[in-house]
Amino acid sequence: EIRRIAPDPTSAFDVSDFTLRAGPARVVLSDGILVPSTPVAGRPVEFVFMGMGRIELDPPDGIEAGQLELFTGSTRLRQPFRRAVFVIALDTAVDAIARRPTRPVDGAAADDAEAMLEAWLAGPERRWLDVEARIFADAVGDPLAAGFFCGSFEGTDLGRFLYVVDPMAHEQVTLGQFVRADLSKRDERRARRTIEKAQREGKLIGLEVADLGTWDTWVSTSFQSDDARSTSGSRGVEPDHYEIDAALRGRDLELEATVRVSLRVVVDRLRTVDF
């Protein structure tokens, strides 16, 4: 089901004045259409939004506010957007969406939703964020994946940027933008040949030309407790013991290694291990 995710325009929802709380941010869908993906474990997880909305975020301290101002020109995020793709592993939010009036779409709107979701599914950000692993963990009831949220926004002033809430990350809240490398056709061909050569040698596995660029971090912070103290994320396990068997082989002294790790589970009802 995860590998076959596709838009379901016949099940689209009409949304207006709908507010989604994701970590410290507010995502307001003022007016538009929300097209769900085909379901995973009985419910959709990824959504395409087309319409008018805005995302609001106040950084938790002066350092993060200064970082945000460096990239956006403001110490607070108040960014309108017309299009977005969401990954929502928040059951209460998905249930609230399901109670909205349905508004099936076809024609150009359906084509736009399909193009947006396909671009997101094929893009590097989804792979970097390990979205498929988070969707799988949520589908099997892993408590750490239940609060995962990702929004890929097309801001009216800031262009395309990401906002992520990942309970498994050390700093669970990330806001930023991937700036692709500006390559000429010649440089792109050269980069592709270099990557392919390295991959034949077992290096740079999984890297694509589209991955080349820089990630600009606008805000990166942990959840804040009621007394304003930072609370770091958890992957649900902690290593107790490592065993490493390593050897250098051949004239090129290639390193071969086997690693065994003993893990201690620190979260109840953990279903998956991302280590």
What label would you give each PLM region?
Residues R260-F275:
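Surface-exposed beta-strand/loop patches in extracellular or lumenal glycoproteins
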Residues E1-E256:
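N-terminal, polar/Ser/Thr-rich
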